[in-house]
């Protein structure tokens, strides 16, 4: 890893830390690339059986680094020989990023519009990051130690379990800079809080403190700021000692059921159960149950 992302392996738990505390762990292109690499390493490493994502310093992640984004927007305008269209935003305005699924029917950006690097970060960076978390065949926990804004909140919502410090907060900041949701928020937020509440949080773009986030279902647990590392670490260690293949099957079922009807979900359950029934963990755990012993899961 580089200075932007830290990787620590403690037993079977990989901790991935966003490491730009001076910028509240805002997401630059470098950080996004390194984070995707860290997630890939966690997914492919047999010694890793649970993943913990957190932020260095006082923030979890402030979302897109708008200084970098504004620079890319300005570069796009300065490289175009045609002057900006009437009414176009001035150079550096952060309102031209085109999220995946946004209304593109209006056509391409006006002459002098933003550079592709500014427009394409959703498809090139954010979408792969969310898919890497959701498809990770291991539990992924977010330890939200401070503000999680915009894409930072999206990364937390993509995780399987979220534990927040008492002083943490969430902010659907997209509309504040003239954007709609990205980083999977249009998919995860309605499933966590309901469609109506998701619309409210996205449109009003007001901070949600950790206790309120717990009430809304955005997080699973809120703990004292000083207890976050210990509580999240203990949960990660517990999951790392569990039936890893079963956890992967659970994630596969939940992801599949989110886009399919009951009959298809039932068939997916049967398919996954059949595969898991052949695992060493299932057979050993069944034998341990009959002997009234505690099972010892090997993750396979």
Predicted regions and their residues:
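C-terminal alpha-helix plus adjacent terminal tail
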Residues: 1-11, 77-78, 84, 88-109, ...
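Conserved CoA-thioester-binding segment of acyl-CoA-metabolizing enzymes
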Residues: 1-58, 70-72, 76-77
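Terminal peptide-recognition signature
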Residues: 16, 20, 35, 53, ...
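Residues at secondary-structure transition points
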Residues: 22, 26, 33, 113-127, ...
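Short hydrophobic/charged patches on amphipathic alpha-helices used for structural packing
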Residues: 39-40, 127-130, 153
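Glycine- (often His-adjacent) and acidic-residue-rich active-site loop
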Residues: 55-132, 176-178, 261
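Crotonase-fold acyl-CoA enzyme core
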Residues: 131-247, 271, 275-279, 284-287
